């Protein structure tokens, strides 16, 4: 049990109870099985990177695999190898955060994530055919890095304004050169938002299938209120209401009045019973 999961009077949260049940169920398959590796994904489309769960490092989505299978945005070869290790009871190095927690006798995020309804509902499907492509229920996406701010806790990778500044003036003198232009090479270098992006194209090809399974969908950036893809999502949701969808937008809320009013108009429409929750 983790600190804070149970109060002094013995009350146990449903979150904890579900995690404990998930642990018992996961252990019937293997001591390293984690449903998040199948049912959750964060997609960084400007760089063609993804991960399932926030703890493992991002890995590349081979662009050539998307032509005939847009779900390869999530079901990458690398991720399938990690899933295979989990089914064999082996502990992937990238998940060391959870292994450390569990070695101390605590529940880890592996148990908490696997205990959430969006993940646990497909336990039997995954166990029956773990190497098959699967549609995630919890998706976070950033479509491009266009942003009007350059917040110090962010990165030029996620802010076109900051990227433009370091190109003109050079990097801030930090001990680790994480905002230096030379740091953003290869997969760290975002595709400019003004250019065609094969990862975004693949996302929209996959979207109708993905949407059917979605329960949690979060759009980040860049600044999503500046991005046409955000409003394309809104239009689709309004045309295809989904009563179990939790829709989330992470915004700096510092856009022009025109964009702010446009966003508010969509929020009013979305909050009239089209989805379960908007934030």
Predicted feature residues:
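Well-ordered, non-membrane alpha-helical segments in soluble/globular domains
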Residues: 77-80, 197-204, 230-233, 259-265
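Detector for the c-type heme attachment site
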Residues: 99-101, 154-160
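N-terminal pre-triad scaffold of radical SAM enzymes
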Residues: 35-52, 129-157, 215-218
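Recognition helices and adjacent regulatory flanks at domain boundaries
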Residues: 106-137, 147-149, 170
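Accessory C-terminal segments flanking Radical SAM cores
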Residues: 11-117
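Leucine-rich repeat
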Residues: 204-210, 234-240, 265-271
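A short acidic (Asp/Glu
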Residues: 38, 53-56, 109, 151-155, ...
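Core AdoMet radical
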Residues: 136-146, 157-198, 211-228, 240-261, ...
């Amino acid at each position: 049990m983790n600190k804070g999961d149970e109060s002094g009077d013995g009350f146990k949260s449903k979150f904890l109870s579900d995690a404990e049940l998930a642990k018992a169920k996961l252990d019937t398959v293997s001591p390293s099985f984690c449903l998040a590796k199948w049912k959750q994904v964060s997609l960084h489309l400007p760089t063609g990177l993804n991960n399932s769960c926030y703890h493992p490092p991002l890995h590349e989505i081979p662009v050539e695999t998307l032509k005939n299978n847009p779900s390869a945005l999530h079901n990458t070869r690398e991720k399938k190898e990690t899933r295979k290790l989990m089914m064999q009871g082996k502990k992937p190095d990238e998940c060391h955060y959870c292994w450390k927690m569990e070695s101390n006798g605590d529940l880890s995020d592996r148990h908490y994530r696997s205990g959430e309804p969006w993940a646990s509902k497909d336990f039997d499907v995954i166990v029956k055919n773990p190497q098959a492509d699967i549609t995630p229920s919890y998706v976070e996406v950033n479509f491009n890095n266009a942003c009007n701010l350059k917040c110090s806790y962010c990165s030029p990778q996620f802010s076109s304004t900051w990227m433009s500044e370091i190109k003109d003036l050079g990097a801030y003198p930090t001990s680790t050169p994480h905002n230096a232009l030379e740091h953003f090479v290869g997969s760290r270098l975002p595709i400019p938002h003004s250019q065609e992006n094969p990862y975004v194209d693949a996302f929209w090809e996959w979207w109708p299938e993905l949407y059917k399974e979605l329960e949690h969908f979060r759009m980040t950036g860049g600044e999503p209120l500046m991005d046409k893809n955000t409003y394309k999502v809104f239009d689709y949701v309004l045309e295809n209401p989904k009563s179990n969808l939790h829709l989330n937008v992470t915004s700096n809320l510092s856009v022009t009045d025109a964009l702010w009013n446009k966003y508010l108009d969509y929020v009013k429409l979305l909050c009239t019973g089209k989805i379960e929750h908007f934030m």
